Amino acid sequence: MKPATHRDKGEQAEQLACHYLQARGLRLTQRNYHCRLGEIDLIMEDRESLVFIEVRYRRKGRFGDAIDSITPAKQARLIAAAQHYLQRTGGAQNKPCRFDVVGITSEKGADNIMWLRDAFRVES
């Protein structure tokens, strides 16, 4: 059996995050939305809000926590991709939107999930 690749681990982390959020009442709208401006891992609905979610995975102790890896440049790409999604879908019926981050760290085979709601905002 070949070892898991970086992409495999990312997909596993996204699946874990999706199940975690669904267990907390969010409904999946789309996974892995791609456009030329960037990618959004998960797009979900939380009551009346549309939620754009970035999932980050890190092994404990390597380069800080998963959530710390969301740089301003990454935030800008997520915002641009979300704007593209909203334009393409007609503004998603003018629902309020937010950006969440799910950080998953693994230590000694155990996963720790941290959900940061409203992790950053769009500056107007």
UniProtKB/Swiss-Prot annotation:
Pfam (any one): UPF0102
GO MF terms, alphabetically ordered: nucleic acid binding
Gene3D superfamilies on file: 3.40.1350.10
Superkingdom: Bacteria
PANTHER family: UPF0102 PROTEIN YRAN (PTHR34039:SF1)
Similarity comment: Belongs to the UPF0102 family.
Protein name, per record: UPF0102 protein Noc_0355
Natural source organism: Nitrosococcus oceani (strain ATCC 19707 / BCRC 17464 / JCM 30415 / NCIMB 11848 / C-107)
